[in-house]
């Protein structure tokens, strides 16, 4: 399983208030979620009028498919005409690597009372 994460800035032209910015950002995030069935959120520059930092996450069983999905999502976000996509950063994380201790370790405790080790 491959988790693909993208973080990018969206430069917003002519935005005069945080309320206006939040409305535009919410529209972009909702449309991306609906079209691509992904996780998306505003992750930075929360108090900046003219810029938003957005984060996206997708999951797939193949690295190439994950890369293509993120490319399509970023092109689509740019095509909405709300702002200019800038400063794109992408990371692909193979979940098998995390299970082998090469990623961020978990606490080993399942919040639902089970064991994470059972997932290996």
Where would I find each of the regions flagged by the language model?
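Long, contiguous binding/interaction regions
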Residues: 2-120
